[in-house]
C-alpha cells in the first residue's frame, strides 16, 4: 500500500514523523495539493469513520501542526475518512485521544485495514512506536473486525461511554 503525505512543514523538523518515514522510503511527501495523489484521506473532520470496507492501495495523510489542522487544510482529493478513537503514544501528545501524529495515523489506519505487520514496520522506526500499538491494541483489533463505518462508530462509542464511567 502506498503512503502519501501532504506536507505543510509547519512543525519541528526534528520531531516530524512524516519526514522520518520519507527518509526510510516508507512514505512520499508532497508540498502541494495538486502534487498529492487521490486516495483514502485520513481526515479528523471527515463525516465517515475509516473501516475495513475502505480497503485501498493508497492512504493519504496531512502532516501539519494540530494548531493549523482546520477543515480548510484537508482540501485534498480522495475519499475522506476519520480515524476512530485512538490514543496518542508520541512524546508530544502522549495519552491524548485523537491527537495522533502522522505515523500514528498511518499505523492506526493500516491496522484497521488488516495490515498489522505494515503498521509495526512504520512504528519500528520510532523508539516509542511499539507503545502506540500496545495502548490501542484492543480497539484496533475490534475496529478491524467491523464490516463498515457504522460498526466502527458503534465500537468507538462503546469506548467513549466506558471512559465516562
UniProtKB/Swiss-Prot annotation:
Family annotation (InterPro entries): RNaseL-inhib-like_metal-bd_dom, Tsr3-like, Tsr3_C
Protein name, UniProt field: 16S rRNA aminocarboxypropyltransferase
Stored NCBIfam families: PRK02287.1
Catalytic activity: an N(1)-methylpseudouridine in rRNA + S-adenosyl-L-methionine = N(1)-methyl-N(3)-[(3S)-3-amino-3-carboxypropyl]pseudouridine in rRNA + S-methyl-5'-thioadenosine + H(+)
Superkingdom, taxonomy of origin: Archaea
Localization terms from the record: Cytoplasm
Biological process annotations from GO: enzyme-directed rRNA pseudouridine synthesis
Species classification: Archaea, Methanobacteriati, Methanobacteriota, Stenosarchaea group, Halobacteria
E.C. designation(s): 2.5.1.157
Annotated residues for binding of S-adenosyl-L-methionine: 17, 62, 83, 102
Function: Aminocarboxypropyltransferase that catalyzes the aminocarboxypropyl transfer on pseudouridine corresponding to position 914 in M.jannaschii 16S rRNA. It constitutes the last step in biosynthesis of the hypermodified N1-methyl-N3-(3-amino-3-carboxypropyl) pseudouridine (m1acp3-Psi).
GO terms under cellular component: cytoplasm
Record flagged with keyword rRNA processing: yes
Main location: cytoplasm
Pfam families tied to this protein: Fer4_RLI, Ribo_biogen_C
GO molecular function list: 18S rRNA aminocarboxypropyltransferase activity; S-adenosyl-L-methionine binding
Record organism: Halobacterium salinarum (strain ATCC 700922 / JCM 11081 / NRC-1)
Keywords: Cytoplasm, Ribosome biogenesis, rRNA processing, S-adenosyl-L-methionine, Transferase
